[in-house]
Amino acid sequence: MKFTETKLKGCFILEPKIIKDERGYFMESFNEKTFQEGIGQKVTFVQDNQSFSTRGVLRGLHYQCGEHAQAKLVRVLQGEVLDVAVDLRPESETFGQYEAVLLSAENQTQFFVPRGFAHGFLVLSETATFFYKCDNFYNKESEGGILYNDETLNINWNFPIQDLIISDKDKVLPNLQNAKKVW
């Protein structure tokens, strides 16, 4: 597994070693020891989540606050998505900046998003199955979110805005300036 830290300290792109032959392929998708050595910290995952979405679905930008903050290790089992993490750590040099990573079943790339970040994704393929591990349990009272098209963030989703499919809840999320503080 190859680990590459992004411009956002603590966010890592993971590229697995894929062994292919005439039968198909094999890869190790997760190894706790390798993972913790690769990101340089101990993270223990307690929950796995999976979603299925169609082309144009944009989910996010979501996060959990305070003691319920979550780190996530995300990947795509089928299809292709643009995955986005936004730094919400107030003391960070990259506060308010984002990283976008193309995740697909073909490239098998994974993205580690630590605590203190908002997270969202846009489905680029006809359908996509999205899978992620969390290091903390979901807590409804601690959920936060930021509007996907916040002008301060200026995220380039590179997708026709009229074709986006967004939940009513996500359409009315606050902008970064008015969002619930992560800590």
Map each language-model feature to its residues.
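Non-catalytic, conserved peripheral segments adjacent to functional cores
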Residues: 1-106, 125-127, 134-183
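Short beta-strand His + acidic residue motifs that chelate non-heme Fe in jelly-roll/DSBH
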Residues: 111, 119-124
